């Protein structure tokens, strides 16, 4: 695989992550926002589809780290590996957060008429919400800043993109911290506003990688031929 195709692959993985995460949230969002929804008009298809899309999002996260590693490691091995690990950690938390959504199906189908299920429902939703704070907020903030820093140093993409990533990553981490301590609500205007920069970072990075690819000058400085094959990927596997 050439470096151009590597960039396209990374861009596709980024597009997959944010499309699947947004559509997934739309699918199961009503269940998280309406306490009685599960007992009245829950749609099994919506929950299963939303959970599936969250898993796709998690796999896309891992894909971005693996796709970028062979190139980014030329600038910093430790930061490149750190990004892979952090993206994998974020993906793991997302997958764990899917489990309580699926458990809501059992609650509705088998225990809907049982006393005390409202408390169980609230606990399952809280489990999912806290996983969203830890993964797509706190861990995402750190891995965003990790990649943005190494991209800024390497010059592999337009300078404004890593600058946006550094700012957006710090802001979403700060937002997650405020949510964790109850200073702001998880679903609020403040939270949405603070998520805009990191959302813009992912769209900008994905678009640049897919349509333009890595900057040839930066690749040359890092000693990466534009026709280099990702035969370097086995080095990742042997780590």
PLM feature spans:
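Hydrophobic, aromatic-enriched alpha-helical segments typical of multi-pass transmembrane helices
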Residues: 1-239
């Amino acid at each position: 695989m050439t470096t151009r195709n590597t960039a396209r692959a990374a861009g596709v993985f980024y597009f997959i992550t944010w499309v699947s995460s947004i559509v997934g949230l739309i699918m199961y969002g009503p269940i998280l926002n309406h306490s009685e929804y599960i007992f009245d008009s829950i749609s099994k298809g919506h929950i299963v589809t939303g959970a599936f899309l969250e898993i796709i999002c998690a796999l896309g996260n891992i894909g971005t780290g693996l796709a970028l590693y062979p190139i980014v490691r030329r600038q910093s091995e430790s930061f490149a590996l750190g990004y892979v690990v952090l993206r994998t950690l974020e993906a793991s938390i997302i997958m764990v957060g899917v489990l309580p959504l699926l458990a809501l199906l059992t609650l509705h189908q088998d225990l809907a008429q049982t006393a005390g299920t409202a408390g169980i429902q609230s606990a399952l939703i809280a489990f999912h919400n806290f996983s969203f704070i830890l993964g797509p907020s706190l861990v995402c903030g750190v891995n965003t800043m990790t990649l943005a820093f190494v991209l800024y140093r390497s010059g592999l993409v337009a300078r404004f993109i890593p600058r946006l990533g550094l700012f957006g990553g710090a802001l979403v981490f700060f937002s997650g911290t405020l949510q964790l301590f109850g200073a702001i609500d998880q679903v609020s205007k403040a939270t949405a506003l603070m998520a805009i920069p990191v959302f813009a970072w992912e769209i900008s990075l994905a678009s640049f990688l897919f349509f333009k690819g890595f900057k040839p000058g930066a690749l040359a400085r890092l000693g990466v031929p534009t026709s280099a094959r990702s035969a370097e990927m086995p080095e990742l596997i042997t780590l």
